[in-house]
């Protein structure tokens, strides 16, 4: 079995039910496409768009809805450069003092937006992502939870065939550069500009790591919540590459959970790219150590199936890459602080 077909087989075990098998079959077809001359490696070029700052111009899809309105207000209060939003049929109106457009394409042309955040109900969220991809928005952050998995397989297939748009999520808290730009639902006040890059599959555990690194005085350089769904647009490796190449990021916290093999892949990446005297300290926590096989634990992707995806295997893989694994989420801040102390980086 080729590596690509093996990846599709892993997904079949990760997603339960007939919809999961159908999704895996569909994704396996997309994996086979490179044999027909279609390039998929180009999507990695969009990693650069993960870095947001005070100059990032954002639109909101689902702008006038309840969630879109609330979180757009929060973003504006934080100082994020929100320039407008879309709600089909409400183009030409204003909302929160900003213009409303019918389409993402129109919004991008009129505002020069470089990012979009999506607060659209699950049945329509995949179409919203596709619209942003077609408009070539550089960064798309989809907060929505509960998008049908087959919808996301089709979105991922579309993503992998282009290089202009980078997707974070779905089912994620978003991305934040403290003090500069907040795209998503994270509480802004717990963040502090600093030295730690945080990437996580869990939203609430992200906030825990943020609060602790703020408390120990290290702060955060960039925080990315990649989401807990099995078919997402950004994984650990995408974020790790940004962190390793970012001079402002001096240490990394990686928060994983049971299900899939993203943590094992991240460990392999760190072995290859973060070793030697100039390596950056990496601390991790893996949620679900006591989870029983076959039972989904919260997130759609958090399930041990087919003998794969267990916490112990993930912890071993990360430790073999030189990562310090904390056994408690309450100790992430003190653990990374001790690593800085040990390396005389304080």
From Swiss-Prot:
Residues 1-40 form a transit peptide. One of its GO terms (cellular component) is succinate-CoA ligase complex (GDP-forming). The modification N6-succinyllysine is found at residues 57, 66, 338. The modification N6-acetyllysine is found at residues 54, 57, 66, 81, 105. Pfam families: CoA_binding (PF02629), Ligase_CoA (PF00549). Its EC number is 6.2.1.4, 6.2.1.5. The keyword Mitochondrion applies. GO terms for molecular function: nucleotide binding; RNA binding; succinate-CoA ligase (ADP-forming) activity; succinate-CoA ligase (GDP-forming) activity. Inhibited by itaconate. The keyword Nucleotide-binding applies. GO terms for biological process: succinyl-CoA catabolic process; tricarboxylic acid cycle. This is Succinate--CoA ligase [ADP/GDP-forming] subunit alpha, mitochondrial. The gene is SUCLG1.
């Amino acid at each position: 079995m080729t590596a690509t077909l093996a990846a599709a087989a892993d997904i079949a075990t990760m997603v339960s039910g007939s919809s999961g098998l159908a999704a895996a079959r569909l994704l396996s077809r997309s994996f086979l496409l490179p044999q027909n001359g279609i390039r998929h490696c180009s999507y990695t070029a969009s990693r650069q768009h993960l870095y947001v700052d005070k100059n990032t111009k954002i639109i909101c899809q689902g702008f006038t809805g309840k969630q879109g309105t609330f979180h757009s207000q929060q973003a504006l209060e934080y100082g994020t450069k929100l320039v407008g939003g879309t709600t089909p049929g409400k183009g030409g109106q204003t909302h929160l003092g900003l213009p409303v457009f019918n389409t993402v394409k129109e919004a991008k042309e009129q505002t020069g937006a470089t990012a979009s955040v999506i607060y659209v109900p699950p049945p329509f969220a995949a179409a919203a992502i596709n619209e942003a991809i077609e408009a070539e928005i550089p960064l798309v952050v989809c907060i929505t939870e509960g998008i049908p998995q087959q919808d996301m397989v089709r979105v991922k297939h579309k993503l992998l065939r282009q290089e202009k748009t980078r997707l974070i999520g779905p089912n994620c808290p978003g991305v934040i550069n403290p003090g500069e730009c907040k795209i998503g639902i994270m509480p802004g006040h717990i963040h502090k500009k600093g030295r730690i890059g945080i990437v996580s599959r869990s939203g609430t555990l992200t906030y825990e790591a943020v609060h602790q690194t703020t408390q120990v005085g290290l702060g955060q350089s960039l925080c990315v919540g990649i989401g807990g769904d099995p078919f997402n647009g950004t994984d650990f490796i995408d974020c790790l590459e940004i962190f390793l190449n970012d001079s402002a990021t001096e240490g990394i916290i990686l928060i994983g959970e049971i299900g899939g093999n993203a943590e094992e892949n991240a460990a392999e990446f760190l072995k290859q790219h973060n070793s030697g005297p100039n390596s950056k300290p990496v601390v991790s926590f893996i949620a679900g150590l006591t989870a029983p096989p076959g039972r989904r634990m919260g997130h759609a992707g958090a399930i041990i199936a087919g003998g794969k995806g267990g916490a112990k295997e993930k912890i071993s893989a990360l430790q073999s890459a030189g990562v310090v694994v904390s056994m408690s989420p309450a100790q992430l801040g003190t653990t990374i602080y001790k690593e800085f102390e040990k390396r005389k980086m304080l």
